[in-house]
A protein has these predicted regions:
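Alpha-helical segment of the N-proximal tetratricopeptide repeat
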Residues: 7-27, 226
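Hydrophobic face of amphipathic alpha-helices that form TPR/SEL1-like repeat modules
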Residues: 15, 46-58, 88-98, 132-141, ...
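Short helix-capping/linker turns of helical repeat alpha-solenoids
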Residues: 38-41, 54, 59-60, 80-83, ...
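TPR/TPR-like (Sel1-like) alpha-helical repeat modules
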Residues: 71-78, 356, 379-396
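Terminal, low-structured helical/coil segments at or just beyond the last alpha-helical repeat
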Residues: 392-416
Length: 416
């Protein structure tokens, strides 16, 4: 690792971590690949993190996940002389004795000191790495210390408390400097503490997501907006969902669409809600809520021309691909009446069996299926009539009941 980060690594950190809204994540990824191939160990280290998924890099970059390649890159970064790579490999459990032997440093402390120097100069990624070294107790291996290094358990515990607590300041520096992930560890530090060494301080965690939202982090804007939505502070929630969506950040357009569809914090605009659901699916094709929302819109013909085939497609996708039972009533109607899909009473009954709330039309459909023995079920007129009666004032149920009568012996039969 050089005394300073290369211009390539600095630029990549800006576009990948510190200012994700530049939209240059892919270019930064390619820049790191080129620098890594040219021998830049820090580039290899950051590139490895980019391949480790949304827990380590903003999901909006849509980088590929490749744990095997990430591991190779971490090992490579150590061999290339990156002190940053040494600490990240240590944190990742990849600094095996054989890998450690390949680093050009006399000790882990020497590598730590190099990264700490860059952290003190203001680099947020290095600040985050240093914070993690304290937070996850990596300092024990770095300093080559353990409980046997102290004359008593009390002194060892005091040492642990002093070292662990150093993470707080480093995480705050990283958080304010552009690494939104630092807030995750701050939240854990404040809400859970650390064993019986660091006491929880939950009051310090309550504004973390608000601060992150105000700092412009899309992920925190979404989290904060979700909290506001739960508190029914809908106008504020809508503002932050819109801010996050502009990044762009996944799931936000669904939330915005939901609020416009239901008039939460804004006047109802179902056409705009539909456009929001469509924007969400363009970003995240598997978004369950947007499939359900579009399915409902197409079924009802609200905000969009009625189209049962599209309704059935979207609702079926959410049900079959995502395991969502939200739209089972609509799916049952499609199958029962043959709307947008061939009529299939058997499938209709499967969906109706999942309608576990009071619904008169659902009871009507169940009643018809059982009374007439449709969809492969044996005719059971008494059961069917019971459902039809349960449907109460539903007009079709009242009409269907006219086809049945009770005999003198109290048995329900179909009228001739």
């Amino acid at each position: 690792m050089a005394a300073v980060l290369s211009s390539e690594v600095k630029q990549a950190l800006q576009d990948i971590y510190y200012n994700v809204r530049t939209g240059r994540g892919r270019e930064a990824f390619a820049l790191l690949e080129k620098a890594s191939a040219a021998g830049d160990g820090d580039a290899s280290c950051v590139l490895a993190r980019c391949l480790c998924g949304y827990q380590y890099v903003w999901g909006g970059h849509d980088f590929p996940e490749d744990d095997a390649r990430a591991t190779k890159l971490l090992h490579k970064s150590v061999e290339q002389g990156s002190a940053l790579g040494v600490l990240v490999a240590l944190r990742s459990g990849e600094l095996t004795p054989s890998v450690q032997k390949k680093m050009p440093f006399g000790s882990l402390q020497e590598a730590f000191d190099q990264v700490e120097a860059l952290a003190k100069e203001g680099d947020a990624f290095c600040q985050y790495v240093i914070g993690n070294s304290y937070f996850w107790w990596d300092f024990l291996r770095i300093q080559n210390k353990g409980k046997d290094s102290f004359p008593s358990q009390a002194e060892f515990k005091a040492y642990l408390k002093e070292e662990i607590s150093k993470c707080e300041d480093w995480f705050w520096k990283a958080f304010r400097g552009g690494v939104h992930f630092a807030a995750n560890n701050l939240n854990r530090y404040y809400t859970q503490g650390d064993e019986d060494i660091i006491a929880p301080q939950p009051e310090k965690a309550k504004d973390l997501w608000k601060i992150g939202a105000e700092l412009g982090y899309p992920s925190h804007q979404f989290i904060y907006a979700s909290e506001l939505k739960k508190q029914e502070r809908y106008q504020e929630a809508l503002h932050w969902f819109m801010e996050s969506a502009a990044a762009p950040n996944s799931d936000c357009w669904y939330e915005i669409g939901f609020m416009y569809w239901n008039g939460k914090g804004v006047e109802v605009d179902k056409a705009y809600a539909v456009s929001c659901y469509e924007k969400e699916l363009a970003l995240t094709p598997h978004n369950t809520g947007s499939h359900n929302g579009l399915g409902q819109a197409y079924f009802l013909g609200e905000g969009v021309p009625q189209d049962y085939a599209k309704a059935f497609y979207h609702l079926s996708y959410a049900y079959e691909k995502r395991g969502s039972e939200w739209g089972v009533f609509y799916l049952a109607k499609c199958c029962f009446y043959g709307l947008g899909t061939p009529q299939d009473y058997g499938k209709a009954l499967q969906f109706l069996n999942k309608v576990d709330w009071q619904n008169k039309e659902a009871d009507y459909m169940r009643g018809v299926i059982y009374a007439q023995g449709l969809g492969g079920v044996s005719a059971d007129i008494p059961k069917g009539v019971a459902y039809l009666q349960k449907a109460g004032s539903f007009t079709k149920a009242k009409e269907e009941l006219l086809h049945y009568k009770k005999t003198l012996f109290g048995k329900w039969v179909r009228r001739n």
